[in-house]
Amino acid sequence: MAKKSDTLKVKVLELLALVGELSSDEIKSFVNSSSYGEKIITALKKETLIRKYKIEDRDLFRLAPRGKKYLKEILPGEFESYLTRQRSMNRIRDDKRRIERRDKLAKMLFMFYRADIKILPDEKTLLKSSSVNARTDGTDTTDAHRPEFYTSMEIKNLVPDYKTSIGSRALGILIANNMLYIVYYTADGELLWKHNSEENFLKSTSRVLARKLFGKDYGTYQLVFGDSEKTVAAIMKRYDNGAKGKIYPSADMPNMIFALANTVKDATLDIALHCPGFINDLKAKYGGDIVYDEKMPFFDGVKKTKYRAENGIIREREEFYLFAFLFDMVKVAQAVDVAVKRKYEVRIYCFDYQQKYLEAFIGKDAGCNITIETVVLERSGEDDGE
């Protein structure tokens, strides 16, 4: 029987509880090793913790009854809502839409996991708290800077009176940097964006969810992921009725900024730099290309603020903003270079130990409109990312 100390084995079981089913390739991708992933699959099958079945010519793995019982024993109370037969993720899929949604959720969770965003139930602060619904102030909340992703099911269990929009395509909520991000994922297809449904979901999240979870209003935004330059990876609304939004390549931040510069004169680019194991890669490849597999999520939008004009009339000012999680120093430098040339304000958030490397890559004379702010995050290892 796998032990709680068998970290990766347990994490695979947790992920299966969260998503419902995974292919062998997905499990190998999750543990970031083909050979070790195969060993984990073999061990879990031998211990009858998982079982295999075939659907649409795909071999998929699900939790076996013994695996569900085992999770409940080692993590009591944390997986009850995931393992009920009423939950759609625990029903074998014969519906193409359910299969696609499961695939999207799995891919997104892998990306978050590699970016050290907490995705598993026993790692999330709010799921360990029993005072969410009674909270009236900002105490006993998740770390304001520690990124955590909550699925739609987890949010519903946390806040029973929180209603999501029926037509929304959102997969969950990402909490990071004092913000709530409604997360969407297009995979390699297009996202069917229902403007009214997503607008209602945004308002509900901002007004109800933020107050319930934090005891106060927090900034709430929409975050869309895509797999390639040919797919949608942008916010599908522009804060005016009927607009379809703009489409930018998900893997090319500099080009995205160039495209934005055609329509926006002044903007703010916020970059959050966060990747475990980052220092070792820099030491090994300093000065060369640093490549990561993670896709580059970002969002854009317009913040409207009212001001009094010289003639005394109240008017609205539109401020354009960008936000990005970047894991590649070369892309950071490229994005900053383009933004500076376009006279954008740039704010970079990073660990204290990353600041000197940022300055080395970007150059101290890159521009006076660049601000590097360090944040304090609890890390599982030392600077080498262990």
Where are these regions (language model features)?
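Hydrophobic beta-strand residues in large extracellular and virion-surface proteins
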Residues: 41-44, 50, 61, 173, ...
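Short secondary-structure junctions
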Residues: 48-52, 117-122, 290-300
